[in-house]
Swiss-Prot record:
Subunit structure: Homodimer which binds Holliday junction (HJ) DNA. The HJ becomes 2-fold symmetrical on binding to RuvC with unstacked arms; it has a different conformation from HJ DNA in complex with RuvA. In the full resolvosome a probable DNA-RuvA(4)-RuvB(12)-RuvC(2) complex forms which resolves the HJ.
Native organism: Prochlorococcus marinus (strain NATL1A)
Protein name as it appears in the record: Crossover junction endodeoxyribonuclease RuvC
GO MF, one annotated term: magnesium ion binding
Compartments, as annotated in UniProt: Cytoplasm
Family assignment from sequence similarity: Belongs to the RuvC family.
GO biological process: DNA recombination; DNA repair
Gene this protein is translated from: ruvC
Entry-linked Gene3D superfamilies: Ribonuclease H-like superfamily/Ribonuclease H (3.30.420.10)
């Protein structure tokens, strides 16, 4: 099984690719799709879709896991929701089964505690994937946690 985990955003979309082979989880790739704030929003959304398509074509995942948001009066809400919609559409274009998880469920799945801080989640991700250096930037590390959640809760 190969899964892509995605941490949505307009400025930065984190992604992480993990293989699960006979119960062992192996990090294949992780990184970010970054868009410049100087571009028009519609150009940034197209860039996210195009870059995500390239990642999907390169790594050919079997499924996807995406962080689900619940916003309350945030100025970034609309932009992030639009980016998330483009991400969901792009995943759908490749007919990938999609799992969605809120942040607390991701923390619970990865650490066993739904109110864990970022360092606890990061340590568990590094341990589970047998990696010695923290994935950078944080969005990529978060995407790996989302992918692990997709594996654990499949």
């Amino acid at each position: 099984m190969r899964i892509i985990g995605i941490d949505p955003g307009l400025a930065r979309v984190g992604y992480g690719i993990i293989d699960e082979i006979e119960g062992k989880k192996i990090m294949i790739d992780c990184g970010i799709i970054e868009t410049k704030s100087t571009k028009k929003e519609e150009e940034r959304l197209v860039e996210i879709s195009n870059d995500l398509s390239s990642i999907i074509k390169k790594w050919n995942p079997n499924s996807a896991a995406v962080e689900k948001f619940f916003f309350y009066r945030s100025s970034t809400t609309i932009s992030v929701v639009q980016a998330r919609g483009v991400i969901m559409m792009t995943l759908g274009k490749y007919k990938l089964p999609i799992q969605e998880f809120p942040p607390m469920q991701i923390k619970l799945a990865v650490t066993g505690y739904g109110h864990s801080d970022k360092n606890e989640v990061l340590n568990c991700v590094m341990h589970e994937l047998s990696i010695t250096s923290p994935p950078k930037p944080d969005d990529a590390a978060d995407a790996l946690a989302i992918a692990l959640t997709g594996i654990y809760l499949k």
